[in-house]
Amino acid sequence: DRGNMAAAYRKVDTIIPRPDQLGIPEAVVQLYKKKRGLVLVTGPTGSGKSTTLASIINKANENLTDHIITLEDPIEYIHKHKKSVVNQREVGMDTLSYANALRAALREDPDIILVGEMRDLETISTAITAAETGHLVFSTLHTIGAASTIDRIIDVFPTHQQQQTRIQLAMILEGVISQALIPTADGNGRVAAFEVMLASPAIRSLIREQKNHQIQSTIQTSRAQGMITLDDYILDLYKSGRITRDMALVYAQDQVAMKKQM
């Protein structure tokens, strides 16, 4: 800063945590078994998206005989070959950009592709194409909530392409997982809260028909299918004593409704 060297550090454990250690819902973990499609993990910077994805990729590595390619900036967790073969590439070191790396990856017959972040139109468009052509693609966005995530993707495209993109998303999207890390009640760390949207026929229909405003209520009524809203998850954490009332309200999407349910 101002002529002096500066650095930003993030502590990353070298051991990849298991999904149950992170509290990742089982319905989310099982998405690694999909043969094709797009799975998005969303949330603000520092919400644990990379760790969640590393844990799911590790689960796939342990259980599938697949070819997995990860494109990251930077590489945070090292995946060793287990049942699968895992190739990891770092933007800036091994490739110029996510879009370049993704195009190259498609020529290598991968089963699963992790794209560290969908930053621009070219990367998003190529990721959608990859999911359409028989690959399972995992990626992240800095959005909160399924509806805003879908809107964000569609808004990146020129107006004349948006309806076609909406139809493509309705076909290929398998899940949107939004997460936040909330300080625990005992002050000894943070606990993850998740919103889970899975691509049921009802959800696919809402995306296709441009009724994103109805997605939240559909998630609320689909808990038996493994879906849950972020606020319902936060409320469960509060009721189980994992987080304080104040923290529940700070992270709630709808504070008025949260207070009533408390």
In which residue ranges do the predicted regions lie?
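Short, flexible helix-loop junctions that flank or precede catalytic/ligand sites
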Residues: 1-262
